Amino acid sequence: MRAIVPVAGVGSRLRPHTYTVPKVLINVAGKPIIGHIMDRLIEHGVDEATIVIGYLGEKIREYILKNYQIKVDFVEQEERLGLGHAIFLSRHTVSRDPILIILGDTIFDADLKRMMSSNHSVLGVHKVEDARRFGVAEITDGFIARLVEKPENPKSNLAVVGLYYIKQPQVLIDCLKELIKTNVRTKGEFQLTDALQMMIDKGEKMKTFDIQGWYDCGKPETLLETNRILLANAAPPTTRKGVLLQPPVFISPEAVVKNSVIGPNTTIAAGAEVENAIVRNSIISEDARVSDALLEDSIVGSNAVVRGSYKRINIGDSSELEFY
């Protein structure tokens, strides 16, 4: 089974962190977002992947090749022309066998094997209160009748959350080719939902699959919430002398923590150093330094330094804050 994972986006909603690191390499619950995605795909039988890279793509390539042994093809999306365009660029890696498509800012907890047992293409959906930020699926007689990308007035609360099982990928590629050839865009981009709608209009049957465990990593507040949810299912942390742990927490074995209170809902990544601090509901990234601080609901970037802070902060890589 092959999965296509588009990760070419800039991740502007996660600034300042994404000035120096691609969104999918931001650490959450002990590993980068893309690491959680790859682990789940492999667990469910995916043995080939196409990673669509763009912004800071070499860093993503380096991480994948270092940590995963499955067959991986990298495709570069030089112009950000939409999700549909990203999938179309992957066409040479696609055979006639079914494929999975999963967006790179979505961590999921779903029974993919059950999803892929369908005789039809399947789109993962999640019921939301406000569907205007999403593609929306409208259902008739158990099948998807209409897909609308970020509608002003949604007629359904079934948000398409970025997990797709495509039974006939060559039909999808043909529809994407037609969209691009005729320059059909929605909100300025070639949308995957428009190609899927074209497939439906041509007679393709598609069903929905309820994704209960869907964790958005696209904004600081949702990233921290995802960190909290994933940590709740993590193994208990190893106790450390002089450190009070309030689970759930993740502390890398390569992190140094002294005379501090850590947790709940806190990740401290490899190489980080935390001393004389209280840190809760936060993510401390690789090689960051935190001392004499009380941090809550905060994200500290890689190689950043925070001293004397009693605040909620969101500080990017290689930055320094001192409050004395």
Q: Where are these predicted regions, by residue range?
A:
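A structural signal for short hydrophobic beta-strand segments in well-ordered beta-sheet cores
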Residues: 25, 137-139, 208
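Short internal beta-strands
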Residues: 50-54, 125, 283, 299
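Short N-terminal binding/cap micro-motifs at the start of the first secondary-structure element
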Residues: 11-16, 132
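Active-site metal-binding loops of divalent metal-dependent hydrolases
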Residues: 10, 105-106
